[in-house]
């Protein structure tokens, strides 16, 4: 449907890494002309898999989980993929970032995600804000 109406897809893959990547590999082979095909929402797999998604043109959605102490793979992913392919997300009402973990998540919590990405990458939060806003505008085809 997204292809027919020329909109990006939002992929939420949970415990289905191999199935998801294979479906998207096949899709990209058949549709190489589609720019910015979508986002892998609430990303939770390896940095290597993220790099493959990025190579296919997808954005990687990073939410509150990146602030959790046990999010080692996600921290590695954020450090290794281009900032130009990251979208920040809330996953509201779930997965509220530290220091509010366990509470209801909403868009006011996005600051913690931005700050954590900036910390991981050793850059200013304003740089993360600016780039991820540009990424969202490009991915969602907003002017």
Predicted features along the sequence, with ranges:
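Catalytic pocket-lining loop regions of alpha/beta-barrel enzymes
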Residues: 1-87
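Residues that scaffold the ATP/ADP-binding catalytic core of kinase and kinase-like folds
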Residues: 23, 97-98, 139
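Mid-to-C-terminal alpha-helical segments outside catalytic/metal-binding sites
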Residues: 1, 108-143
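Short amphipathic alpha-helix initiation/capping segments at coil-to-helix junctions
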Residues: 67, 103-110
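Short acidic/histidine-rich active-site segments
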Residues: 84-106
